[in-house]
């Protein structure tokens, strides 16, 4: 909440009277979020190593706003739980390529769709950048 005041003046022929008017506003907590695509490049079905990629997520929240950034299982989900969804890309006709998104560079913590598996942050009033780490297994 921001507070302030403004001075009021009244002029009359006989003299001047002044008073103070208090001014206030409540700032609602809010956030905006944006990201760039995670592009894995070319997949080789005979490769023995995973394909890795990253994407950035930029969140701007008002100062003090608590935010939880979660990720769904995507447009072509496989079986799995919200905590660790099986994510799949599709080329159509029932053909899928499994991938996963992680919240850490070691690619050991799945970025899920629940509070324990999402990424929490507190707004600072300026943009905060998070990195999402992706992997397509061999």
Predicted regions and their residues:
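Cleavable N-terminal signal peptides
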Residues: 2, 11-12
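N-terminal signal peptide c-region/cleavage motif recognized by signal peptidases
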Residues: 7-9
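N-terminal small/polar-rich segments of proteins
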Residues: 13-91, 117-138
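Predominantly extracellular/luminal cell-surface or secreted proteins
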Residues: 72-74, 100-104
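Solvent-exposed strand-loop boundary residues in beta-sheet-rich modules
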Residues: 93, 105-107
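Amphipathic alpha-helical hairpins/coiled-coils and adjacent low-complexity
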Residues: 94-96, 100
